[in-house]
Amino acid sequence: MGGPVKVSAVSYINSYPFIHGLQQSGIAPALDLSLDVPAECARKVVQGEADIGLMPVAELPKVDGGQVITDMCIGADGRVETVCLYSEEPLKEVRTVLLDPESRTSARLVQLLARYHWRIKPQWTEAEAGFEGRIHGTTAGLVIGDRAFALNNQHSHIYDLAHEWKVWTGLPFVFAAWVANRPLSESFLSGFSAALRWGVDNRTQAVQAMLSPEIDPTPKMNYVQRSISYELDLAKQEAMRLFLRL
């Protein structure tokens, strides 16, 4: 293969099963694994700095010759808990939405929900790190990833985007899929997929192994067990196609 395969994985807890599976697998020596926020995963794959990435779905069309290479994903069939719009006011009162810079898929999703499902027209503002403190009054904020755990009891109105998508379309949602920007051997892809699946099959073990010892693992184990749906099944493939068409 001419050196290790460069893999960019998302650094969030929902990806711990994938990371743990890859690190514990027989193909680990063949990988150069980096952990990044979703937007950086996408950038690396698009610009050729990584061969494979766990890419936000909204970025898939930007990858020249990109191929989804496994039947594993980061998805949800109902509430996901970690991709939410937070507000002190009901949706109809929201005037500005701060968009989390870490994933364009979630930003695109909240804009679609606002236009077609909620029927509101707020001002959209791309936020910078630390923007969570600016969520007040008629300014709402889209927060994704592990930072959302700390906000789930702090705001009067919380709109879980995967749940809202399900209410609107009747479909699950796919936040990220494994994409390669170049051909890879069948034997490598088979080993890669098997490693991901092993991690998902042992996801509570993965969370325990990767969390800091001082953190109670139980809530996070429940999260990966109940809120994240890892199979890229037919319903999720349909959801991906619909999302990319809208």
Give the ranges of each region predicted by the language model.
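Short, well-ordered beta-strand elements
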Residues: 2-11, 31-34, 95-99
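Short, polar/charged alpha-helical segment
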Residues: 11-32, 36
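Beta->alpha turn/N-cap motifs
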Residues: 13-14, 37-38, 49-61, 72, ...
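A bilobed periplasmic-binding-protein/Venus flytrap-type ligand-binding module shared by bacterial periplasmic
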Residues: 21, 82-91, 96, 173-188
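Short helix-initiation/N-cap motifs at beta->coil->alpha
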Residues: 32-43, 120-137
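A conserved helix-loop-strand patch within extracytoplasmic ligand-binding domains
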Residues: 72-131, 161-166
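Pocket-lining segment of extracytoplasmic ligand-binding domains
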Residues: 126-209
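Secondary-structure end/capping motifs
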Residues: 184-246
